[in-house]
Amino acid sequence: MRDLPGIEALLVAGDDARIALDHLTGLNKYGCPPRPDPEQLAFGSSTASVISQSGYAAAARLRERLLDRTDTLELSWQRIRQELLSDNSDLNVQLAFVPSGTDAHALAVQHLSGLAPLSVVMVEESETGSGVRAAISCHHPQINAVSLRAADGMPRTSEKIDAEVVALVEAAVALGHHVLLVMVDQSKTGMIAPSISCAIALSERHSEKFSVLVDACQFRIAPATLRAYLRQGFMVAITGSKFLTGPAFSAVLMLPEGYAQRVEDCKDLGLLLRWEAAMVEHRRFCALEQSQVIRIMENFAQVVRQRLAEDQRFELLPEPLLDRRPLLTEESWDRLPSIFSFVLYHRKDRPLTREETQRVYSLLQLSDMDVIDGRRCQLGQPVAIGKGVSALRFALSARLISDAILPKGMDKLKDDALAVLEKTAWLVDRIRD
C-alpha cells in the first residue's frame, strides 16, 4: 500500500455515524476519542470503551507493516481469524467479519432468507441493540419480540419468558415457517434469554425448521461456552468492542458446519485495525489462570454490591442467574456477573427520570467540574427498565481484569470503582428534584 490515512482516521473509518467524531468534541457517539485516555476510569464496557494504549500501539504497528508491505490485508485477516477460532478449528466453523453486532444479525437472517417464509423470535431491542429489528427487517421476515422485564422494570421469570418463546415458535412452525430464534447471552443488563435448555429443546424438536443465533455480542462467555454453542449447531455473534474493550464497531458472525460453505465478509481496513486492537486484550485475558479471573470478579462484585447497598441514592437491580445447563456443566468464570445495573434515586425516594439519568451519565465523562473527584468516568449507557426509568450499568471488562493481576492492581480497581460511584452520587445530588 503506497499511502494510508493516519491511524486515528482509520480507527473510525467505516461510514457509520455512531463512530464518526463530533467536530467540536473529537468524540464519537459513545463519548470515546480515537486515541487512548489512560486517566479515564472506564467501567462502560457494556456499551463502548476507549482504545487501550497497547491496542493503539498494535494497530499503529499493523498500519506500518501494511505501508511497507511486510504484511498484507489477507494475511492479517487470516491471523485474526485463526486466533478467534483457537481450539474450535476442528469444528469447520466459518467466520464472517462485519462492522457491528447489528450487521451480524442481518447476515444471519440473510443466510436463512431463502427458507421462505421466515419468522424471527428475538429479545426486545431495549436489552440487545437498538438497530437490530430495522436491520433484519430488510429481508422481510415476520418478527416477534419478547420482553425480558415486566412493566415495573423487574425481570420476568425464566419460565414466563421460555413459555412465550415456545408459544411463538410453535405457532410459526405450524404455519410452515422456518424459525430463527435469537437468544441473548448476555443482554445489556447481563441476562440470558430464553434459557439455553429452552433453545436446545426447540432445536431438537424442530430440527430442519429451526435455527438459533446466539447474540453473544457482549462476548462475556468463556471459550468452553463458545465451543459448546458451536457444537450445538448454533450461530454465534460476538464483538471485540464490549468485554474486550476494543474500539467500537468490530464484530464476527460464527457459522457452524451446515451453513454456507463460503461467506462474504467485510474487508474494511478500519475494521481490521479495530480487531487488531481488540485482540491485544483478548490475548492478555486468555493468558490468565481461570482461578485468578474468578477471584478478581468475586472481589469486585463484593465491593460494588456493598457500595450500592449502603447508599439510598442507588438501587441495584436483581442480578440474573447465568445458568448454561444443559449446554455444559463445568464451572467457569462466565457464571459470574460482570454487569451490575442500578437505578439512581433522589433523596426523597423518587427515581431519577430517564432524562436525568442520561444527564448524570453524560456529566460523569467530563473532567472540568469542581467535584470531589474530577476524573473522567465512564459507565454503560442508561437502559430503559420500566416506565420513565433507566438504569446505569457498572461493567467489568477483560482489560480491567488483566490490569488487576498486576502489583496493587486489585487495590486500584476497587479504588477506581468507588471513585466512580462517589462522583455518581455527587451528581445525583445536583440534579434538580
Indicate residue ranges for each PLM-predicted region.
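Polybasic, low-complexity association/targeting segments
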Residues: 22-67, 190-195
